Swiss-Prot record:
Keywords of the record: Hydrolase, Plasmid
Protein species of origin: Sinorhizobium fredii (strain HH103)
Active site per the UniProt annotation: 44, 130, 164
GO BP term (any one): detoxification of nitrogen compound
UniProt xrefs under Gene3D superfamilies: Carbon-nitrogen hydrolase
Protein name: Aliphatic nitrilase
EC numbers on record: 3.5.5.1
Domain called CN hydrolase: residue spans: 4-270
Protein purpose: Nitrilase that hydrolyzes preferentially phenylacetonitrile, but not (R,S)-mandelonitrile. Also acts on dinitriles like phenylenediacetonitriles (PDAs) 1,2-PDA, 1,3-PDA, and 1,4-PDA, and cyanophenyl acetonitriles (CPAs) 2-CPA and 4-CPA, but with lower activities.
Disulfide bonds: none
Gene Ontology MF terms: nitrilase activity; nitrile hydratase activity
Family: Belongs to the carbon-nitrogen hydrolase superfamily. Nitrilase family.
Catalysed transformations (reactions): a nitrile + 2 H2O = a carboxylate + NH4(+)
SUPFAM superfamilies, sorted: Carbon-nitrogen hydrolase (SSF56317)
Length: 308
């Protein structure tokens, strides 16, 4: 089986309503399946929300009661992994027969993580926690470790996620290429014109399919209770999308789209990967391990280790 159809979902969550967002996600999964998709990618922080324009009312050297409450409200929208929400998503993946990458805000103890969840028709198959929150994201998200760099096997090759500006970390990309990634999923909150160029570069560099999804987010899709430092105009666009699919030779086969909520699809052929690797394999015949070598630590890093 070499040919398949991929989908990238461009949409926004329902503000302050996890149950409604899960329901919307399931409906979008069904819509992607109805359009013949075998694989679908959702944006970064789709479930739980990307706090675009928020700063939790923080100041250097001081926090405020208002900001603490904003964070508590935001945390309430995060999900446990695994949990009841992942069970619902797993059931939807099973019924649709889809392989999925979905961006969520994961709650683990007192810390939130920006996480990509992997689902197969058999259920929840793994996750990747964002290693490096960008800029002010560090106000609300913790740092993942190397233990969640796994990929998931599909009938069309291995699928994995690199989240937003992790894609600008050359060693992170190389680690994924070393795993033989075929379906390189890039959930993002970056809606700039330059993002499409980044996705094309990665497809060429890794000789893989790149599937990137970004939210189409307006102010009214953003929680009213959370202060927004960009705008309070309800129809103002905070994230304009830019969903895109690129083949292993860097050719754009769908998108980028900035028109609103949508699902883009493309028919792909995994035989394009060996054809592209004929003249370039970044971790194979085009590598120089005698000169350059990457060491990846995938051991979990726990703050408390108990030994008997």
């Amino acid at each position: 089986m070499t040919k398949f159809r991929a989908a990238v979902v461009q949409a926004a969550p329902v503000p302050n309503d996890v149950e409604a967002t899960i329901e919307k996600t399931i409906n979008l999964i069904r819509e992607a399946a109805a359009r013949g998709a075998n694989v679908a990618v959702f944006p970064e922080a789709f479930i739980g929300g990307y706090p675009k324009g928020a700063n939790f009312n923080i100041h250097i050297g001081a926090r405020t009661p208002e900001g603490r409450q904003e964070f508590a409200d935001y945390r309430a929208g995060a999900i446990a992994v695994p949990g009841s929400e992942t069970e619902q998503l797993a059931q939807a993946a099973h019924e649709a027969g889809l392989y999925l990458t979905i961006g969520v805000i994961e709650r683990d103890g007192g810390t939130l993580y920006c996480t990509a969840l992997y689902f197969t028709p058999d259920g929840l198959a793994g996750k990747h926690r964002k290693l490096m929150p960008t800029g002010a994201e560090r106000l609300c998200w913790g740092f993942g470790d190397g233990s969640t760099l796994d990929t998931v096997q599909t009938p069309w090759g291995s699928m994995g996620a690199v989240i937003c500006w992790e894609n600008y970390m050359p060693l992170m990309r190389t680690a994924m290429y070393g795993k033989g990634i075929a379906l390189y999923c890039a959930p993002t909150a970056d809606d700039r014109d330059s993002w499409a160029a980044t996705m094309r570069h990665i497809a060429l560099e890794g000789r893989c399919f790149v599937l990137s999804a970004c939210q189409y987010l307006t102010r009214k899709d953003f929680p009213e209770s959370m202060g927004n430092r960009i705008t309070d105009e309800p129809d103002a666009v905070l994230m304009r999308g830019g969903a895109i699919i690129v083949d292993p030779l860097g050719r754009v086969v769908a998108g980028p789209d900035y028109s609103g909520e949508t699902i883009l699809t493309a028919d792909l052929d995994t035989d394009d990967i060996p054809r592209a690797q004929f003249d370039f394999d970044v971790v194979g015949h085009y590598a120089r391990p005698d000169v350059f070598k990457l060491v990846v630590d995938e051991e979990p890093k726990s703050a408390v280790v108990t030994r008997a």
